[in-house]
Each structure stands twice: as structure tokens, then as C-alpha cells.
Amino acid sequence: MKKIEAIIRPFKLNEVKLALVKGGIGGMTVVKVSGFGRQKGQTERYKGSEYSIDIIDKIKIEIIVSDDKVNSITEIIIKTAKTGEIGDGKIFISDVEQVIRIRTNDLNSAAL
């Protein structure tokens, strides 16, 4: 199993979510995050002074999938989240050793 973490633009969340549901995911976790990277922040003016805001709000989506679904799910995210501009985000893929559904004690794929 793999954990897919995607950092995307907030306005892309609904489009990405709908495409992922169509693609067969059973659920996902969504977290509001902030950070910086190559995307430059914005310059604001306050009381005559300019200052730079370089921490940008983003959305992080976390999905656990079987190994055979990793490519199709990442392609869906790329296709729907991409604008072609700096700041579109990143996808991180890592191994998941075990998943346990708390309510039923189901393990791994049965817990997804």
C-alpha cells in the first residue's frame, strides 16, 4: 500500500476531489496547510510600507491506495490540479506498512 500526499491550490480541491471519486477512491483526508517553495508570495502595502507575504495557503490531500492504483490516482491529481503555473504543488508517495480500521479491526485493503 502507498500513501499519496498531494499539495494543491485551494481552488482546485473540488475539481480534484470529484475526479478522484470518479477514479474509484473510497476516501481521503484534506488538510489546510501553508508553506513556501518556488512560488513567490505577494507584496502587500500597509500604512505606506511594503512587505512581502511568502507563506502561501495550500491544501494537502492524503490518500491510501493499493500499489496497483498509484499511477492512475497520481495521473488524476496531475491532470486536474495542473494550471501550468509555478505553485501548482507537489505529490509525495510513501510506503504504508499497515492500515487498521478502528471500528472493526479490519486490516490493510479491507480497512480502506
Curated annotation (Swiss-Prot):
Gene3D superfamilies noted in UniProt: 3.30.70.120
Source superkingdom: Eukaryota
Keyword annotations from UniProtKB, A to Z: Chloroplast, Nucleotide-binding, Phosphoprotein, Plastid, Transcription, Transcription regulation
Subcellular location as annotated: Plastid, Chloroplast
Coiled-coil regions listed: none
Cellular component terms per the entry's GO annotation: chloroplast; cytosol
Stated family: Belongs to the P(II) protein family.
Name of the featured protein: Nitrogen regulatory protein P-II
Organism of origin: Porphyra purpurea (Red seaweed)
Gene: glnB
